[in-house]
C-alpha cells in the first residue's frame, strides 16, 4: 500500500472519539471500510468485539484456513460516566450534569485540572485529533487506533492485490481497563484453536526501541514473554520480505498477546514505538501521542506479508536448530581436549 493511500485511512480511524466501553465511533469507521471489501466477512461476538475474516480461495477453489489473526483494541483511556459504580477517580466538569470517572492508567498528576472534550457519556482530552508533521503522526489516541487502522489497511492491501489466502482481524473493546474485550473474545469459541494471534500495538518508546527505526517485533510485554516459535517465524517473514524490524521486549505495559496466550493461544506481538504514552507529556502535561508514519507504513507491509506467507509452522525453529547442531558438530573434536 502506498503512503498516499494509507494516510486517509489512518486519519479517518484515528480521529474517531473513543473510551473504554464507548468504542462505537471507531467500530463504525472500521466497518465502513470493511463493508467495501468483497473478500472480507464480518461478525461480532455478544460483547461487541469484531471479528473480520479475509479469504480468497487458492488454486482449484480449495478452502484456505487462516494461520494468523491480527488483534487491536478500539478504546483509549478516557473519562466515562458509569452510573452507580466508582471505577476510578471522579470529576465534575463545568456544565456537565454527571461526574465522570477516568478509566485507563495515567499518573495521578496528569488528572489535575484536565481540559476535556465531551461526547455525551464519555470525554477525551481536548487535543488535536490527527496531525502529520515532519514524518510524525500526532494524535489524541494513537493507542490503539493506529493498530486498528493497520489491520484495516492490511485487508485493503490484500484485496487490492488479489492475494490468495486467509487471515483474521480482531477488534476488541475495553483493553485499557485490563484486556477485558480480549479475555471475553478468547473464551468465546469464535477463534480457531490452532491460529497464531498477533497483537498490534503502539508501545511506549524505551531503549533500545526507537521511533522511526521501523516496526518492532515485540518479544514480550510487562506481564509475559510471547511464543518463541511464533516470534522466530515473524522474524523470518520480515527478512524474506526485506522489511527492516527492531526486536525489543517493550515492557511499558501489558498487551492483548498476554490475554490470548493465557487462554491457550499461540501469541506474538508487533508494534510501533510511541511517544507521550497515554497522552503523558513532559512534566506530567497532557499532550498528543505520536508515532512515525514510516513505522506505521512498514507495519502494514509486514502484516500483509505475514498474512499470505507460505512459511510453514515451526520452520524457523527447525532452521535454527539445524544451524546450531551443525555448528556444534563443527567443534566436536575440540571438545575432546581437556579444559
What spans do the regions from the language model cover?
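N-terminal hydrophobic/helix-forming segments and targeting peptides
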Residues: 1-339
